[in-house]
Swiss-Prot record:
Keywords: Aromatic hydrocarbons catabolism, Cytoplasm, FAD, Flavoprotein, Monooxygenase, NADP, Oxidoreductase. Belongs to the PheA/TfdB FAD monooxygenase family. It is an enzyme of class 1 (oxidoreductase). It catalyses: phenol + NADPH + O2 + H(+) = catechol + NADP(+) + H2O. PANTHER family: BINDING MONOOXYGENASE, PUTATIVE (JCVI)-RELATED, TRK SYSTEM POTASSIUM UPTAKE PROTEIN. It holds the Pfam family FAD_binding_3. GO terms for cellular component: cytoplasm. This is Phenol 2-monooxygenase. FAD binds at residues 10-43, 295-305. It comes from the Bacteria. Gene3D superfamilies: D-Amino Acid Oxidase, subunit A, domain 2, FAD/NAD(P)-binding domain.
Length: 671
């Protein structure tokens, strides 16, 4: 028995986060409330005074009553607006109360739709609190600052008033002549002072899980109503209401100070915004995964964030914590209910230890990130936790041990149930259209450090056999606290990536099969490449092509040239390296290229020429294609337009029919 303040309990839970509450609810759901204080849960206080005291923050009786009554919290749609999120609702309620009392108070409001929490101000004297949404909150307490092409960005009102958010953190805004300062304070301790000067007078400070950073942009003369929104967790989008342009400005870390708080290094990272030049600012987040060396000490078990720290992305920490507690609590229940022998929880350590991130990994990846940053290559890391059934855990444990043994000489980033993907931006070669967005899926014993090194080189690089992917959980952090399979949070396998990197042309594609729809998107400078099932799905792609005026790659099942392509905007500049390739076979082996060999033969490429080429090629191979289709192939009738690099013309073979067995292995081919 555990003694605490003269009261006895069977299980004492320290920490009332997702893991702690999940553990308490699971224990209580099996009738462990027969005696008082069987399960107790404590959490640290949230006061700003810095107290280290703990309180019994959540009554287990309340949890038990909710479980017994079948009560549940409100259903939340992961795709809903932020108005449906608890943090916003609470903020609005506090704002209403303050307004009703007549207090002249500004509320620090944090956007919680993504991990990037953007500080917005709500003026409770504006009598708008009852109908506030994220944008009106921004407008009520902020003034807009002019930026490029009419896109507007909110600038904080600078005053000396102390603001306090409902989560117990405080901010101080100070006036200082025509410049400003914004100081973040947590638990009464100032952490960082960020300058808003005249030269870079527009600044937004965000807080990403205790990692403050700022975005900067030069002043311009345009003025158009806009709004601040967030997408992708770390991207701040600045978009106008009536414009098709979605501008994005991302943070770039300083290579000399990788682990410090985020900031934009003007000397190397801040550039003029020129949409025509297609310059990209990619985002990245240096972070260090950590894990406890031991998961158990006597009758004390570590679970959740107490035993492993993950990046604040994709819900991986939450899902892993829930899995920890579920693994542990059902074994504790066996002891509490008298149906199990003593100490069944010893298997908890063996079954959950493979989640740990090794220290060697941190050092290797930090070194690689520093190297990439020095080469103007920034990396954005996202992680998702793959679903592994309990029957597979023991089977994969041997592989994990082998990985651990190899880690000293070949550092590993992922363990057997982790998948990592990188989005990298390539800059610094002086070519306006240099851009690459490779995604690398890591499985089992793949080495991240090797992959990054190859990406940083200027040699040809193609993905190796990373293994077959399985379904994995949603990347949304506000998904339900559950390890169960949910159809709206998952999509099936057939994930394979084959990026090719070159110092002048970066051609990267991502292939994903979702149900019966396969969409392939790629970028070469401003070129948009789309591969789809039928002509109907081509239309939205053509809209993008019309606005980009870039290259085209279309595949379809139809026997006729799609009429929509007649309206497409075809590339008319720098086409000396472009040619048309058609495939009318079912096996993907019937690629036919134009007999023209001289560079520049397709400088007059347009819809008419491409259509004539397609029809000519199709007529010559129709009999073969139909025969192959009758055998279940169904892949004939395809046209590809692609660039050539150093005389090697690239296109990609993507079987379109569900019957094609090679759908899980799309590859680049050279012709």
């Amino acid at each position: 028995m555990t003694k605490y303040n003269e009261a006895y309990c069977d299980v004492l839970i320290v920490g009332a986060g997702p893991a702690g509450v999940m553990a308490a609810a699971h224990l209580l759901s099996y009738g462990t409330t027969a005696r008082p204080h069987r399960v107790r849960i404590f959490d640290a206080t949230k006061e700003v005074n810095g107290s280290d005291e703990s309180t019994e923050s959540l009554s287990t009786d309340v949890i038990a009553d909710a479980l017994n009554s079948g009560a549940s919290g409100p259903e939340k749609d992961a795709a809903s607006t932020t108005e449906d999120l608890p943090m916003l609702v609470t903020t609005l309620q506090v704002s209403d109360v303050l307004h009703d009392t007549g207090d002249d108070t500004k509320i620090a409001y944090r956007e919680t739709a993504t991990e990037q929490q953007v500080l917005l101000l709500a003026d409770t004297t504006a009598n708008t609190s009852s109908t506030m949404n994220p944008r009106s909150m921004c407008e009520a307490g902020c003034r807009f600052h002019q930026i490029y092409q009419g896109h507007c960005f909110p600038e904080y009102e600078l005053d000396s008033e102390r603001l306090r958010s409902v989560d117990g953190r405080a901010q101080v805004l100070e006036d200082e002549h025509e410049t400003g300062q914004l100081r973040l304070e947590r638990l009464g301790r100032p952490e960082e002072l960020l300058e808003l000067d005249e030269e870079n007078s527009m600044s937004v400070v965000t807080n990403l899980k205790a990692a403050p950073y700022k975005f900067l942009m030069k002043d311009v003369d345009e003025n158009f109503p806009g709004e601040l929104s967030t997408s992708g967790g770390k991207t701040t989008s600045i978009s106008a209401d009536e414009s098709a342009i979605d501008a994005a400005l991302h943070a770039v870390w300083d290579a000399d100070d990788l682990g410090a708080a985020w900031h934009l290094d003007e000397a190397s990272g801040l550039r003029a915004v020129d949409w025509n030049a297609a310059q990209w600012f990619k985002s990245g987040q240096p972070w260090t995964p950590d894990a406890a060396k031991s998961l158990q000490e006597g009758r004390v078990f570590l679970a959740g964030d107490a035993r492993h720290r993950h990046p604040p992305l994709t819900g991986i920490g939450k899902n892993t914590s829930i899995a920890d507690c579920y693994n542990l609590t059902w074994k504790l229940l066996g002891v509490l209910l008298g149906v199990a022998r003593a100490d069944p929880a010893r298997t908890y350590v063996a079954e959950r230890v493979y989640i740990r991130m090794r220290a060697a990994t941190d050092i290797a990846v930090d070194a690689e990130m520093e190297s990439l940053a020095a080469k103007w290559i920034t990396v954005q890391l996202t992680l998702s936790r793959s679903w592994i059934s309990s029957a597979k855990e023991a089977e994969r444990w041997d592989a994990v041990l082998r990985d651990s043994a190899m880690s000293a000489s070949k550092p590993m980033w992922t363990t057997s149930d982790m998948r990592a993907s990188f989005d990298a931006g390539l800059m610094g070669h002086g070519h306006a259209h240099d851009h690459v967005t490779p995604t690398i899926k890591e499985f089992a014993s793949s080495s991240i450090s090797r992959s990054i090194s190859e990406l940083a080189s200027t040699s040809w690089w193609e993905s190796r056999g990373w293994g077959n992917g399985g379904p994995f959980e949603s990347l949304m952090e506000d998904a339900r606290w559950t390890g169960a399979v949910e159809s709206n949070c998952r999509y099936a396998a057939y994930d394979r990536d084959a990026p090719v990197l070159h110092e002048h042309v970066a051609w990267v594609t991502r292939f994903t099969s979702r149900a019966r729809t396969a969409v392939l998107e790629a970028a070469v400078g401003q070129a948009h490449v789309v591969d789809c099932w039928d002509v109907g799905l081509v239309e939205p792609a053509l809209d993008d092509l019309d606005s980009a005026g870039a290259g085209l790659h279309v595949a379809h099942h139809a026997d006729q040239w799609p009429a929509q392509l007649d309206e497409a905007v075809w590339p008319r500049e720098s086409l000396s390296d472009w040619r048309i390739v058609t495939d009318t076979s079912a096996t993907g082996e019937g690629y036919q290229t134009s007999p023209r060999e001289a560079p520049g033969d397709y400088a007059d490429l347009n819809a008419d020429n491409a259509k004539a080429h397609f029809n000519g090629q199709f007529a010559g191979h129709k009999a073969y294609g139909d025969a192959a289709a009758a055998d279940g192939g169904g892949c004939h009738g395809r046209i590809l337009v692609g660039p050539a690099v150093r005389g090697r013309h690239l296109h990609r073979e993507i079987p379109l029919g569900e019957e094609c067995q090679r759908a899980a292995q799309p590859l680049f081919k050279e012709v």
